[in-house]
């Protein structure tokens, strides 16, 4: 959520920045109209309360019963007026907050302007679009031939966009998760295990609501929601708390399954595990002082890149343009790995600085020094990494001509020393 003071003091600049992201600035006018109503109602409430206090003092000094009764009646009328004004004020404040929650974050000056994802800028690359010395097979062919991916039974269990991993495939999935968490521990993150369901308020705090409501799974009976990313519960950890400056920075890493209902077009990514309604991800999350947040973003980016590097995957880092920037982000790097079987660069991490956007929604503050007025922290989030596409890249880059898959060296200790995935039934 943006700072209302910024909107009041620089409405034209806010509109200009929103326009960079293709957002109509009319909502800023709505917020300001609600703000004007709110301030007028506050003034009227305070004026009526002052009148009531004055009448109350007069009553105490009155001896004439008729005059006293008239003043008591005047106080009652003022009380009714105050109650009605308070009701109107609460309604306007709710309307203003609802409008504020619809406004995306503003892009950082470094973010390039653009009209779509083709305007994203590659800022770093290690490795090329690897060409194998034999025809590269896509991961779904490899997985089915090796008996480690079972799409038919995934559909049987849960419907389209679900799959089952078997044997060495399931072990590979588990190995990647554990290795990533251990790596982030060495990078300075504290591992966190959170619920995989959250209250609705936590989704509002993280910025998932209202924008992504149609993509989320909700249990109607309990009112709890399945997490679409560990970013959501990690944001909510310190909601409505005041941290001390000495506690910052806080670096957390968490694994969760992620659940999303997003509707996918029939002709796009219909094969394989690239897009599904349930997937695993390890998330990195930071709470930092405002003046340190862009330095922290570079650490987040380096830590995500290190994951791809140690796995031996060709990768590149893109700075997202304004058209591709997420709702809450001011600046985002995407890390993509090359997958020769599908012939694509696949996004495995998105590292974003959201500044105080989430902290303001979640009311997460810190004291710059003892006794100082609390200020909002800055928060950052980054995938470290998203598993389906990481698994795709491992399978397709490490495939052998005989259809087996070599296991990256860093993962072998997590798989009991296994060096190669072969068809166990062969």
UniProtKB/Swiss-Prot annotation:
It is an enzyme of class 6 (ligase). It catalyses: tRNA(Ser) + L-serine + ATP = L-seryl-tRNA(Ser) + AMP + diphosphate + H(+); tRNA(Sec) + L-serine + ATP = L-seryl-tRNA(Sec) + AMP + diphosphate + H(+). Gene3D superfamilies: Bira Bifunctional Protein, Domain 2, Serine-tRNA synthetase, tRNA binding domain. Its EC number is 6.1.1.11. It holds the Pfam family tRNA-synt_2b. Consists of two distinct domains, a catalytic core and a N-terminal extension that is involved in tRNA binding. NCBIfam families: serS (TIGR00414). This is Serine--tRNA ligase. It comes from Chloroflexus aggregans (strain MD-66 / DSM 9485). The lineage of its organism: Bacteria, Bacillati, Chloroflexota, Chloroflexia, Chloroflexales.
């Amino acid at each position: 959520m943006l700072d209302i003071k910024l909107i009041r003091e620089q409405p034209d600049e806010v509109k200009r920045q929103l326009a960079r992201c293709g957002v109509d600035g009319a909502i800023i006018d709505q917020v300001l109209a609600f703000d004007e109503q709110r301030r007028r109602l506050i003034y009227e409430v305070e004026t009526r309360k002052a009148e009531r206090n004055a009448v109350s003092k007069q009553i105490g000094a009155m001896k004439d019963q008729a005059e006293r009764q008239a003043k008591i009646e005047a106080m009652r009328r003022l009380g009714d007026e105050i109650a009605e004004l308070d009701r109107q004020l609460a309604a306007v404040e709710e309307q203003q907050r609802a409008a504020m929650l619809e406004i995306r974050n503003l892009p950082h000056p470094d973010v390039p302007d653009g009209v779509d994802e083709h305007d994203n800028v590659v800022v770093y690359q290690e490795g090329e679009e690897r060409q194998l010395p034999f025809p590269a097979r896509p991961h779904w062919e490899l997985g089915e031939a090796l008996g480690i991916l079972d799409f038919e039974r995934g559909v049987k269990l849960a419907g389209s966009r679900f799959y089952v991993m078997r044997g060495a495939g399931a072990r590979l999935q588990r190995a990647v998760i554990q290795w990533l968490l251990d790596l982030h521990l060495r990078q300075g993150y504290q591992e966190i295990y959170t619920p995989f369901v959250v209250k609705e308020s936590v989704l509002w705090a993280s910025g998932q609501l209202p924008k992504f409501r149609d993509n989320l799974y909700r249990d109607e009976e309990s009112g709890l929601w399945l997490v679409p990313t560990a970013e959501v519960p990690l944001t909510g950890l310190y909601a409505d708390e005041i941290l001390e400056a000495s506690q910052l920075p806080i670096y957390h890493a968490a694994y969760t399954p992620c659940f999303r209902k997003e509707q996918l077009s029939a002709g796009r990514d219909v094969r394989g595990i690239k897009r599904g309604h349930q997937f695993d991800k390890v998330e990195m999350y930071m709470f930092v002082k405002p003046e340190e947040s862009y330095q922290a973003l570079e650490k987040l980016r380096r830590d995500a890149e290190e994951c791809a590097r140690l796995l031996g995957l060709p990768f590149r880092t893109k700075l997202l343009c304004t058209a591709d920037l997420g709702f809450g982000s001011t600046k985002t790097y995407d890390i993509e790995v090359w997958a020769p079987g599908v012939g694509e660069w696949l996004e495995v991490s998105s590292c974003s600085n959201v500044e105080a956007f989430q902290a303001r929604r979640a009311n997460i503050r810190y004291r710059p020094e003892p006794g100082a007025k609390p200020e909002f922290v800055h928060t950052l989030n980054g995938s470290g990494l998203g598993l389906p596409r990481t698994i795709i890249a491992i399978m397709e880059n490490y495939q052998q001509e005989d259809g087996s898959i070599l296991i990256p060296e860093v993962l072998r200790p997590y798989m009991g020393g296994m060096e190669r995935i072969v068809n166990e039934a062969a």
